């Protein structure tokens, strides 16, 4: 039986208590190691970076990573403002044993570190986690082949690369592979799980639902025209993917028949105030069209980007909308609830002895969650090609300078 949509009034004290209890039930079992690999896109031939988190016995230390997965080489006090800090054992050996593999696919304009807190939670509970920065994804390129065909194939190539890795490959249980996808990453997960995408469905969606205007106007006119010209999208299903989690997913490229073909367990999250992928046309529709057993939660007051981990302080000036939530919504509190939920979902659905991969025999605990929005990485076209850390420092400098001028010289 499908778990019905849940409408929640934000994160109340009771919900917070439930989240603490739930997190306690899923206490970490391992320290977390990190390293980076590069994988070749089978469509464009480009190399793209993939962040790997995995269980280890090695002692962690503070690691400051930039958006490009490089180490921040500035003083720690500066790195904390402009880079992503995690407690990790860099390049350490994995622990003994067998692990599941989870690939996390970000939304358009996103990065491999968008869902780093979820990656840490999964890795500390015995999963290898791989999160790419999809080729051209950080540039909000949603044109034809690079997204509709490229993204799912990139995830399949990541699975290949991890299984072939001499250190991690022998530890992966091949029947315990899942995908988490946010926004266009949700499209990616659905396509890998057996829902055949169609550009005709996408075009029809935008013709029929003119009120989904922001989604249908997303990207450049050239990118939208490239999508119209792509023609039939091939079936990119990967039978190795045994369960998926969707967060504020893009459902427009799928008709109901395609969604009915998904034959793996699904847990989906919608955001009530998602103004990029309107919930009634995307997450709510998925909940009705996916096969029985789908677990669905609609989060009250959440926005499209509420699923993305919080950004370092100075980077919030750069990423803009992706760092903001609807008024009154607590992103960090929501993540304290959703991360253990997702760990629990994969624990239940990717059990090594689980013969049936469709739906869930037992409904997941109904705790709240959130969602996400996608926009340009910056507003200044001359700066959009620069490293996020440089843009953040410039933005921080400008903000402080204006504040000093206003305070000292009464300049507006």
Provide a role label for each language-model segment.
Residues 171-181:
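Alpha/beta-hydrolase fold nucleophile elbow
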Residues 27-102:
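Domain-level recognition of soluble alpha/beta enzyme cores
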Residues 278-287:
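Short alpha-helix in the alpha/beta-hydrolase fold that links the catalytic acid
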Residues 252, 273-277, 305:
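Acidic catalytic loop of the alpha/beta-hydrolase fold
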Residues 91-99, 108-139, 275-277:
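Short substrate-entry loop that stabilizes the transition state in hydrolases
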Residues 163, 186-198:
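Short glycine-enriched nucleophile-adjacent loop
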Residues 268-270:
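Short beta-strand/loop motif that positions the catalytic acidic residue
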Residues 145-170, 207-213:
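Alpha/beta-hydrolase active-site loop
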